[in-house]
């Protein structure tokens, strides 16, 4: 039931849980409201961008690691992969909405960070593996292009030989070095 209850709640109640957690930590004095960053990979990258988009005053910075940002492109990819790998990818239509259904398409547009990027106020570090077949590099490129067109601040880091998550020791060290620099720059005292 918990899994099914998440259907069409990406960017909605699922995101509200993250926001509620952050606000709780602020209220408890655990987190400094002026120095909060959000960092996630894959779906967590989507959640990062949703946080920066739908609650732009909550975060000082965000790190999107191999994250989904274009829900329409995700649907196209799921259709392609569904033909290749079978019905598993059909579940994405239940989770993220069916672009052939006008009501679902409204949800897709409303919850797509790429479509709502104009709301972003904080700097973003975009990290991706050029060989990612799950969330293709085009997601990161489209986000960078959109942020450029909007004059938004972002940094870009792509590992040429990594995929959906980094497994190489050196590329992982390089990535976390970039993360450390980015956070030090944007979460100063």
Residue ranges and their predicted role:
Residues 1-189:
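Active-site-proximal cap/loop segments of hydrolase catalytic domains
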């Amino acid at each position: 039931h918990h899994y099914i209850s998440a259907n069409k709640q990406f960017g909605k109640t699922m995101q509200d849980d993250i926001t509620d957690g952050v606000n709780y930590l602020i209220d408890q004095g655990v987190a400094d409201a002026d120095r909060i960053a959000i960092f996630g990979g894959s779906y967590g990258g989507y959640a990062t961008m949703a946080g920066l988009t739908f609650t732009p005053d909550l975060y000082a910075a965000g790190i999107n690691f191999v994250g989904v940002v274009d829900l329409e492109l995700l649907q196209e990819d799921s259709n392609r992969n569904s033909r290749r790998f079978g019905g598993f990818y059909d579940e994405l239509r239940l989770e993220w909405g069916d672009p052939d259904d006008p009501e679902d398409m409204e949800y897709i547009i409303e919850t797509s960070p790429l479509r709502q990027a104009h709301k972003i106020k904080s700097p973003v570090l975009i990290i991706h593996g050029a060989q990612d077949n799950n969330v293709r590099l085009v997601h990161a490129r489209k986000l960078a292009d959109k942020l450029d067109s909007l004059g938004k601040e972002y940094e870009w880091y792509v590992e040429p030989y990594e995929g959906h998550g980094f497994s190489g020791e050196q590329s992982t060290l390089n990535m976390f070095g970039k993360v450390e620099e980015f956070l030090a720059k944007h979460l100063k005292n």
